[in-house]
Amino acid sequence: MARIIALDGAQGEGGGQILRSALSLSMITGQPFEMSGIRAGRAKPGLLRQHLTAVRAATEICGAQVNGDELGSQQLRFTPGPIRGGEYRFAIGSAGSCMLVLQTVLPALWFADGSSRVEVHGGTHNQAAPSADFICRVWEPLLARMGISQRTTLIKHGFYPAGGGAAATVVEPATSLRGLTLISRGETLRTTAEALLAAVPYHVGEREVATLEAHFPQAEKNVVALEAHFPQAEKNVVALEGGCGPGNALSLMIQSEQLTELFAAFGVKGTSAEAVANQVAHEARRYLASPAAVGEHLADQLILPLALAGEGAFTVARASAHLLTNIVVVERFLPVRFSCEATESGYLVRVSD
């Protein structure tokens, strides 16, 4: 029997990413694991509905034996079986993130015995998770360059706290994975500001987009790209239908020569449209102020596929606790090593086998 890998869920940032990465890697490598202190660093530790759905989705896809799969559990033992392609459907039962559930199981399905389709119901635009737009516009184009055939479709928007959204991904087995090198993002080609509204007054989106646009003509003069590109940003205000609200999301997509990045914030009761726009502007400005190719959140999403490819590198302005914790977990399962080298403008992250 394979050696059981013992993991401490309280290590590093102590969040759900430790569990999600462990589930993905356990399915792929066939190595069982047991974890204690699940989400110990969060206000509500243990398995929430989103995490429990990820565990049960992984269990179904590989026929795993599992202990501790219940709400609030802070301990889990997971013994995987063979990965099986096919049609899968999972419901979170809350506004928990569909995207995080998908990101848990999709890497395993890159190594399945056939094509797969996975549909998840829950939240699609969540504050503490990649949005469906991020997955479709940012992450999947990079995966395609690595040799991964995966396409996610947003079926219905779902916002916190109601949820009610859905997304589905069709994925094909990968014959081989190629490394990816993202050292420079190149010139900015196009920027698009988009406000999504569901059962929220239209003027909220108009104010968000106007505030976002107004930020950049007065931006610091040493950030060359800002004045050159943001006044020309495309501006869209989209009113959604179909009872998927209330909810509001504002995003700024920055398409560069080497990759696309997307920065988003979400409207909540008691927060003005201008404050939402200021949050997006702050994140986008911080990204453009650095020559690093990859934003902080995308860096987290690249660790697992690069590790599976066994090679690759990227630059990022900040090595977050989330990033470093994910690296530690990956290195427990795979015979790869990451280096995170400080540079004048941030960090150079490399992986090799």
Curated annotation (Swiss-Prot):
It is an enzyme of class 6 (ligase). InterPro entries: RNA3'-term_phos_cycl_insert (IPR013791), RNA3'_phos_cyclase_dom (IPR023797), RNA3'_phos_cyclase_dom_sf (IPR037136), RNA3'_term_phos_cyc (IPR000228), RNA3'_term_phos_cyc_type_1 (IPR017770), RNA3'P_cycl/enolpyr_Trfase_a/b (IPR013792), RPTC_insert (IPR036553). It catalyses: a 3'-end 3'-phospho-ribonucleotide-RNA + ATP = a 3'-end 2',3'-cyclophospho-ribonucleotide-RNA + AMP + diphosphate. ATP binds at Q103, H297, L298, A299, D300, Q301. NCBIfam families: PRK04204.1-2, PRK04204.1-3, RNA_3prim_cycl. The gene is rtcA. The keyword Cytoplasm applies. This is RNA 3'-terminal phosphate cyclase. Its EC number is 6.5.1.4. Belongs to the RNA 3'-terminal cyclase family. Type 1 subfamily. The keyword Cytoplasm applies. GO terms for biological process: RNA processing.
